[in-house]
Amino acid sequence: MTHPTELPLSPLSALQFYATAPYPCSYLDGRIARSQVATPSHLINSDIYTELVKAGFRRSGVFTYRPYCDGCRACVPVRVPVGAFTPSRTQRRMWKRHRALVATVSPLHYDEEHYALYMRYQSARHAGGGMDRDSRDQYEQFLLQSRINSRLVEFRDLDAPGGEPGKLRMVSMIDILGDGLSSVYTFFEPDDQHTSYGTYNILWQIEQAKSLGLPYVYLGYWIRESPKMAYKANFHPLEGLLDGRWNVLDPDRVELPPVDAALARAPLPGGHSGSG
């Protein structure tokens, strides 16, 4: 018989969790947000991060967090089960439209052309939000710092005559987890109108997950009230983490508490509870 002190510890047992001070919500105007943060960051390797993502966490650089807002649970972690995914007619058109793009996967690294595209994207899509003024250091801290298995993917047109690289269209950062791929951030050429690069990028990740034998693509948070998040509801089937469990989510019918309802915080994996 195994003595209780000899039982294996949860891989998260060395972590601590705390709640941040309130700050303005970046998704819902006029709302106040808080995050629950997992620390210390140097202990969060790929295996531990996989468990955290399954519990609704995300990362920004080496900062690992999940929403922990008072009176709101509008952010629903979502993922696509790639084996069951069926593209819509529109998604099939987007796939065919951009299939000539050349994807190159590499370790995270700084590239001046990537940074220039990032700044054009932020200025066009998120002007006045603060990120349109990101310095190179801020860009690197946000997207190029990672202690887990992360990759940078650039999408270009076919090489030009003479061997010059094709025009850069999109850059995506992804994490490779034990059970899937996790979309970190994607930015693309803002002057290309009606391209649906973001949709194509998710379709590409779904195909990559299939080729790697990974069952899921994690898309971060879906927020019903946020138009910027609406595209995530177009992938079927879609699973959402509600009340601590992943289940197939019907965005049109799922019963979510009103934004002002009392917060119901999901338990941490391994039996931890959040502070604050």
UniProtKB/Swiss-Prot annotation:
Catalytic reactions of this protein: N-terminal L-glutamyl-[protein] + L-leucyl-tRNA(Leu) = N-terminal L-leucyl-L-glutamyl-[protein] + tRNA(Leu) + H(+); N-terminal L-aspartyl-[protein] + L-leucyl-tRNA(Leu) = N-terminal L-leucyl-L-aspartyl-[protein] + tRNA(Leu) + H(+)
The UniProt record lists the keyword Transferase: yes
Gene Ontology annotations for the cellular component aspect, listed alphabetically: cytoplasm
Source domain of life: Bacteria
Transmembrane segments: none
SUPFAM superfamilies in the record: Acyl-CoA N-acyltransferases (Nat) (SSF55729)
Localisation per UniProt entry: Cytoplasm
Enzyme class name: transferase
Chief place of localization: cytoplasm
The entry's keywords: Acyltransferase, Cytoplasm, Transferase
GO biological process: ubiquitin-dependent protein catabolic process via the N-end rule pathway
Gene Ontology MF term list: arginyl-tRNA--protein transferase activity; leucyl-tRNA--protein transferase activity
UniProt family annotation: Belongs to the R-transferase family. Bpt subfamily.
Name used for this protein in its record: Aspartate/glutamate leucyltransferase
E.C. numbers: 2.3.2.29
Protein's job: Functions in the N-end rule pathway of protein degradation where it conjugates Leu from its aminoacyl-tRNA to the N-termini of proteins containing an N-terminal aspartate or glutamate.
